[in-house]
């Protein structure tokens, strides 16, 4: 996850660097190399000034950033005795939206465990050179990676949690059956899609992809990207973190992905986070909810919703 975020930031930094050089050619690699030959100190100052400008671009223009100046590669290049300290500084320097994702993954606790096993450097080394940029792996392909890893390490628990991943092919059929009324070329009004048990966000992402694929022009694609608003809620922290990260990295600034149990009310008397979309209305909804999961521990909370949501009755608490 961290390497994916870093890879996306690296692409943006390259773009920012090009913009800066177009405005001031003295920052080009060629001119800095020439400056090195005559005045090494000024050349180093120029490099630091360029880094500072790129960092300003990053924090001002992107919905997420890292203000530490570290990368996984540069952490490894420093003293081996400082790897943990520098890595923690790196992790703690992300913007608040990425920091929330790190928390949901319980990443800092994992770092402590890995350090105790003396494996932090080897794990960083394993991923630092990998190209996880969108140029090599699309967001959907990266979703496959996340889902396969989560499945691999949670298969024993999946039956109890209702955590099952819907194949992409099935999602596409579901989206086709919805017959969403939206013309990418002529639409003027936004439409909203909602998944109350969104997992890693596959259904929402593919639903939007499906509509983008209908566009015949670049304007139609842009129109769809702007007007199709994704909304979702997920109970399991890691799945929520993956979904949230995916939306941020894709630039889905209008999306509304929340964490909690969408089946219970969100009120102070209940410790768990409940429905974060109460009172909202959506144009279309699709989902693969956790069928067959025992919800007896939430029964009392569900009853508080009364007929407002479950007017037609409720299934047994063991299903």
Regions inferred by a protein language model and the residue ranges of each:
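Mobile active-site "lid"/loop adjacent to the S-adenosyl-L-methionine
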Residues: 291-319
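Glycine- and acidic
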Residues: 155-160, 191-193, 225-230, 309-315
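Alpha-helix N-cap/helix-initiation motif
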Residues: 122, 160-163, 186-189, 232, ...
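Conserved active-site aspartate in kinases
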Residues: 288
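Conserved S-adenosyl-L-methionine
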Residues: 164-284, 292-294
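Non-catalytic, mostly N-terminal accessory regions of nucleic-acid modification and defense proteins
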Residues: 1-182, 256, 262
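Short, solvent-exposed loop/helix junctions and linker helices
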Residues: 117, 279, 318-319
């Amino acid at each position: 996850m961290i390497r994916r975020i870093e890879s996306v930031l690296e692409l943006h930094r390259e773009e920012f660097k090009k913009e800066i050089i177009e405005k001031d050619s003295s920052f080009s690699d060629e001119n800095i190399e020439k400056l090195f030959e005559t005045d090494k100190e000024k050349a180093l100052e120029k490099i630091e000034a360029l880094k500072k400008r790129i960092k300003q671009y990053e924090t001002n223009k992107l919905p997420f950033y890292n203000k530490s100046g570290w990368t996984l590669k540069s952490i490894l290049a420093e003293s081996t005795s400082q790897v943990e300290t520098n890595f923690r500084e790196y992790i703690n320097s992300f913007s608040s939206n990425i920091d929330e994702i790190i928390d949901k993954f319980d990443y800092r606790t994992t770092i402590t465990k890995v350090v105790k096993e003396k494996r932090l450097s080897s794990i960083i080394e394993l991923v630092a050179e990998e190209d996880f940029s969108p140029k090599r792996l699309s967001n959907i392909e990266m979703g496959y990676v996340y889902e396969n890893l989560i499945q691999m390490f949670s298969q024993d628990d999946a039956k109890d949690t209702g955590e099952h991943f819907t194949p992409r092919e099935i999602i596409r059929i579901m989206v086709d059956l919805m017959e969403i009324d939206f013309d990418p070329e002529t639409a003027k009004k936004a439409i909203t899609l909602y998944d109350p048990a969104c997992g890693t966000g596959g259904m929402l992402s593919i639903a939007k992809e499906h509509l983008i694929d209908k566009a015949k022009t670049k304007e139609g694609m842009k129109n769809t990207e702007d007007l199709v608003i994704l909304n979702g809620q997920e109970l399991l922290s890691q799945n929520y973190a993956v979904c949230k990260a995916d939306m941020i990295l894709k630039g889905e600034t209008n999306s509304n992905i929340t964490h909690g149990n969408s089946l219970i009310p969100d009120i102070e008397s209940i410790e768990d986070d409940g429905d974060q979309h109460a009172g909202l209305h959506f144009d279309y909804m699709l989902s693969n909810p956790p069928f067959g999961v025992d919800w007896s521990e939430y029964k009392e909370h569900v009853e508080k919703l009364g007929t407002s949501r479950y007017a037609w009755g409720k299934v047994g608490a063991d299903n």
